Amino acid sequence: MRPVEQGNRERFLDTALTVLFDRGVSALTVRGVAEAAGASTISVYARFGGRAGLLDALYERTFDSLRELLEGLPPASPDGVADLLHLALEYRLFARESPVRYALMFERPVPGFDPDPALRSAVVRTTFTLFIARVQRVCPPEADARETAYQLWTAMHGLVGAELMLASRTPLPDWFIPPTEEANERMYRRGVTAMMTGLGLRNN
């Protein structure tokens, strides 16, 4: 792909991400992205082949953002447990930064869109490999680091998913978790810490 074409492709993806953030998944159409970018629908079709191609590329871009977050974490310290908890907290902030982006990554909010299986496998493998590396440092020798990482991730995903779900609805007047950032962060931290302890993760 020529540099100009690559630049235009990236511009459309940047625009699509902005549309996703500002207007939600319903606005992720070829026409909607083209109008937001000040371009023709033909130019979007020429680079992505249609809405499915655009959504596949955007799906890949969202995982690129998560990969960049994981790669940008501070270097490993002697306290691998603290490092892993820090990763988990950053993951929560990533999800909260844009619930619609997070939904595009892990749910199916766009009717009729299911990411290409090969693409889905590639992006998940890349990001999960970075996560496994952090878990490996504190994983018991007898445990499988991949399985342990998956179990920890499901806890992280479940906790933040429940938080996002509750945040999108009218607060329950008698719910035991106050609808505050401090309370939600504390609940998430405690849940992740309990899971890490249960998995036997420790500094070796």
Q: Model-found features: residue ranges?
A:
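Helix-turn-helix
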Residues: 11, 19-53, 57
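Generic hydrophobic, amphipathic alpha-helix propensity
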Residues: 8-16, 33, 58-62, 66, ...
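Alpha-helical DNA-contacting segments of helix-turn-helix folds
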Residues: 20, 55-62, 105, 120, ...
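Amphipathic alpha-helical packing segments from all-alpha helical-bundle domains
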Residues: 70, 114-139, 146-150, 182-196
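Hydrophobic alpha-helical connector segments
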Residues: 57, 71-101, 124-126, 142-152
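N-terminal intrinsically disordered/low-complexity leader segments
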Residues: 1-7, 18, 77, 171, ...
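Short secondary-structure transition hinges
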Residues: 93, 97-130, 174-181
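Amphipathic C-terminal alpha-helical segment
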Residues: 133, 153-175, 194-203
